[in-house]
């Protein structure tokens, strides 16, 4: 059977192997991609974190605008196996394309390095900071000072054909 997923997953949820899931638009796991300005807001994001569990052998297909966005404080538990990998791909049958859907984005409270690093994550004195992510306006905020931040498990997972372009030098 098939099931279309869209919007925000705001409670613990499991994708089951017997269903082929289609990501339509941006599918957010949790609501942690907001700008955090206080310890109370940070605590609320952490307390509101949810887990999306994907069973081994599950197939997830992204529509042209499909993106799975795992926000700060939430987790993706995608624990496949060598005989039953979890597969993310586009709607077509082949695995030979690129840019056919968005992809999978992990945000979190880990330090941000590289392009766009303003040093804010290291100078704020807080466990959170707010870095605008690449890939489009929907990505919003991520980042923090927790080097051991954990956004879940990704084991025996194939991610094919992704790469949404939001603008020049701005893509997933």
What are these regions (language model features)?
Residues 1-172:
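Beta-strand/loop edge motif enriched in small/polar residues
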